[in-house]
A protein has these predicted regions:
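Hydrophobic, regular-secondary-structure patches
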Residues: 7-76, 82-89, 93-106
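A generic local secondary-structure boundary/capping motif
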Residues: 17, 65-67, 98-100, 119-123, ...
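Extracytoplasmic
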Residues: 22-24, 70-75, 107, 125-127, ...
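Soluble periplasmic/extracytoplasmic beta-strand elements of cell-envelope proteins
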Residues: 28-30, 57, 74-79, 110-113, ...
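A generic structural signal for short hydrophobic patches within well-formed alpha-helices
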Residues: 85, 116-117, 181
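Short, solvent-exposed hinge/capping segments at secondary-structure junctions
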Residues: 112-127
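Mechanotransmission and gating elements of multispan inner-membrane complexes involved in transport
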Residues: 135-140, 145-205
């Protein structure tokens, strides 16, 4: 079963806004059980094509380990589509001389939270790539060669970081390309959520 979460409720906007940030969508469709579902599900298409929907995007989240030089951290990778800027006010929380960029024709980029940047010691514009490790799905750990049990890839800096002043995000999250994360997880159309922005906020009758 799919669940739709409303981030901003009419009549409670100020209170709810204190718990949500420029990082969060107005609406999020997730699965009731499990971690992922098929983003191409026909029911999803029906919702996304409603006239009230302005922007929708597929997102995928997974825990990972990252390493920069001799420092490591456990993080949450959030893979998003290129229209994520249209869905949220992400531009309002970016710092640095670069641009919000998820990938180009050569490499993939990671936009990190400010606290995570400090933890890893990367600085705003790191030159060396950030190593990303994810356990291979449905694979047993090879004790003789533990590294063979992980998929590894690299992320580069687009020259910006985000700061929302919430440790949950600033200290853990890395925004990157949806395709990059799907490839690391051996996924095709799987998503963690469908995030939506409405043309105007829904008014809930009392």
């Amino acid at each position: 079963a799919l669940v739709c979460t409303l981030s901003v409720f009419n009549g409670f906007q100020d209170m709810v806004a204190s718990f949500f940030t420029a990082f969060d969508p107005q609406l999020k469709i997730t699965v009731r059980e499990g971690k992922v579902f098929d983003g191409q599900d026909k029911r999803i298409g029906v919702v996304c094509l409603l006239p009230e929907v302005d922007v929708f995007t597929e997102t995928l989240e997974e825990n990972a380990m990252v390493q920069y030089k001799d420092r490591q951290a456990m993080v949450v990778l959030k893979g998003v589509e290129d229209n994520f800027e249209e869905l949220t006010a992400i531009d309002s929380i970016l710092y640095g001389a670069g641009d919000f960029l998820l990938h180009d024709s050569i490499v993939n980029y990671g936009v990190m939270g400010g606290e995570l940047v400090a933890t890893l010691g990367t600085g705003l514009q790191f030159v060396d790539p950030l190593q990303v490790y994810l356990p291979k799905r449905n694979a047993k750990v090879n004790m003789a060669n533990p590294g063979a049990s992980f998929n590894r890839d690299y992320l580069y800096s687009p020259g910006v970081v985000f700061v929302v002043n919430q440790q949950e995000y600033d200290g853990k999250y890395i925004l990157t390309s949806l395709d990059f994360l799907r490839q690391l997880l051996d996924y095709t159309t799987e998503v963690s959520a469908i995030e939506l922005k409405l043309l105007s906020l829904i008014h809930i009758s009392e």
